[in-house]
């Protein structure tokens, strides 16, 4: 549930100072679509995203929180996991007579769940940003050095990540299609479950989360806008599945969602 409005807002900063917060509520259907291996998946996730532009660039962060209830079959209720990303971009070049700009990007990722902390990482590198004249079509591409930090029994190592972020608003602002796609190199569930050790546990991980929204209240405004829609989490080597029940590495986890852009 992340980065999905960053692309549009990052382009706006080229015009004027700008800030926005949105809150999302997702009902996760992954447990139903993957009963063989995700029977313990959380049913509810909330996301808070904040973007603020200034003269030098922009700051962005999001926080995901996962929840379980009595009906989920878990003895633990309430918040059972949290994850956040915070990033800073500095604009250093703009292509004359075009809507293309370049930024220097720095980012931190970290979080935890009931089994312990996730492996933290730091990312740095360049980013390319593009938008059309009315900002209804946007695209960002990042090519980043990613350093996985040592901790919790996992070795630190150098890696990379490529990220694409897009946004398209159409049908007289009624519909928005947005999302991101990440590809990186790190420890994978499949290699760990096979009993591999050290660097042999690592492999390519792919994650994309396209979202489709119907903007039902204040659709022509960036603020006080209410949207209803869905997110599809599509991944390979990302989900830590129940190895006793499944051997596959590709997963589809859809949600039903509400979003309030403040």
Where would I find each of the regions flagged by the language model?
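Outer-membrane beta-barrel "beta-signal"
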Residues: 250-262
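Membrane-embedded beta-strands of outer-membrane beta-barrel proteins
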Residues: 48, 86, 124-126, 162-166, ...
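Transmembrane beta-strands of outer-membrane beta-barrel pores
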Residues: 27-31, 65-69, 106-112, 143-149, ...
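Short glycine/proline- and aromatic-enriched beta-strand/turn motifs that initiate or cap beta-hairpins
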Residues: 19-68
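Outer-membrane beta-barrel transmembrane domain signature
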Residues: 148-227, 234-237, 260-262
């Amino acid at each position: 549930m992340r980065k999905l409005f960053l692309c549009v807002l990052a382009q706006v900063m080229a015009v004027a100072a700008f800030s926005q917060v949105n809150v999302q509520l997702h009902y996760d259907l992954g447990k139903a679509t993957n009963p063989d291996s995700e029977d313990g998946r959380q049913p509810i996730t909330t996301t808070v995203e904040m973007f603020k532009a200034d003269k030098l660039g922009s700051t962005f962060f999001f926080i995901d929180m996962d929840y379980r209830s009595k009906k989920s079959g878990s003895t633990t209720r309430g918040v059972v996991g949290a994850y956040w990303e915070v990033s800073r971009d500095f604009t250093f070049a703009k292509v004359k007579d075009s809507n293309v700009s370049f930024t220097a990007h720095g980012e931190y990722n970290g979080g935890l769940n009931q089994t312990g902390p996730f492996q933290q990482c730091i990312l740095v590198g360049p980013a390319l940003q593009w938008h059309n004249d009315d900002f209804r079509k946007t695209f960002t591409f990042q090519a980043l050095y990613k350093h996985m930090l040592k901790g919790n029994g996992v070795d630190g190592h150098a890696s990379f990540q490529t990220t694409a972020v897009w946004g398209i608003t159409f049908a007289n602002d009624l519909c928005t299609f947005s999302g991101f796609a990440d590809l990186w190199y790190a420890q994978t569930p499949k290699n760990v479950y096979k009993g591999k050790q050290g660097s042999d546990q690592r492999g390519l991980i792919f994650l994309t989360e396209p979202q489709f929204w119907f903007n039902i209240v204040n659709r022509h405004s960036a603020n006080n806008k209410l949207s209803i829609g869905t997110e599809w989490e599509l991944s390979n080597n990302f989900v830590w599945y129940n190895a006793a029940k499944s051997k596959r590495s590709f997963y589809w986890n859809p949600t039903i969602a509400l979003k309030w852009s403040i």
